[in-house]
Amino acid sequence: MGDSQYSFSLTTFSPSGKLVQIEHALTAVGSGQTSLGIKAANGVVIATEKKLPSILVDETSVQKIQSLTPNIGVVYSGMGPDFRVLVRKSRKQAQQYYRLYKETIPVTQLVRETAAVMQEFTQSGGVRPFGVSLLIAGYDDNGPQLYQVDPSGSYFSWKASAMGKNVSNAKTFLEKRYTEDMELDDAIHTAILTLKEGYEGQISANNIEIGIIRSDREFKVLSPAEIKDFLEEVE
């Protein structure tokens, strides 16, 4: 008996021990645009492709990298609307923490809270899993941190990771290039080169997005002009 008859039931395990709706959510992530993150010695970079459905779309209106708090940013692969819901929930969680303790939420705790929301949507009736994986980058008292959260609600800390449709090539490239003592500028160059590896067409400052956080603990999304400078450095 195959898994297909279980594919519409979120809360029923198939005979092979899978929740098939989560498998489908991971397929949505795997068909999304490539995103990646690299933890450097003095910061973290997250980057993603920004392919638009039409040349008529105003590219400035599309933002795939968002800040959750002043010192934490996030990027996704998968379904954009699902990402926006999670961003809103994570920001609310961070605000509640700040209101209660009068300090910014630790990166690990915000990751844990976000993962708990995603996990809840894998065992409730009448809902479906989120069709996104997240890379969350932050800098707090524990230094630079990078986490990946998947639709199942599982999360891990990474030195460098990638997700989306070009994930295997991107991870292979990152494994070759990554070093423990990598500085942030070198990590930005590596991120651009990794995106270039599987990009169909010409990469430019307008079709990729890059977010960085340094030891000043201020998450920043780079402007097209800043991305252009880094692109010129790697060419």
From Swiss-Prot:
SMART domains: Proteasome_A_N
SUPFAM superfamilies for the chain: N-terminal nucleophile aminohydrolases (Ntn hydrolases) (SSF56235)
Pfam families linked: Proteasome (PF00227), Proteasome_A_N (PF10584)
Record-level GO BP terms: ubiquitin-dependent protein catabolic process
Major subcellular site: cytoplasm
Record key words, sorted: Cytoplasm, Nucleus, Proteasome
Self-association and partners: The 26S proteasome consists of a 20S proteasome core and two 19S regulatory subunits. The 20S proteasome core is composed of 28 subunits that are arranged in four stacked rings, resulting in a barrel-shaped structure. The two end rings are each formed by seven alpha subunits, and the two central rings are each formed by seven beta subunits. The catalytic chamber with the active sites is on the inside of the barrel.
Record NCBIfam families: PRK03996.1 (NF003075)
Protein name: Proteasome subunit alpha type-2
Species for this entry: Oryza sativa subsp. indica
Name of the coding gene: PAB1
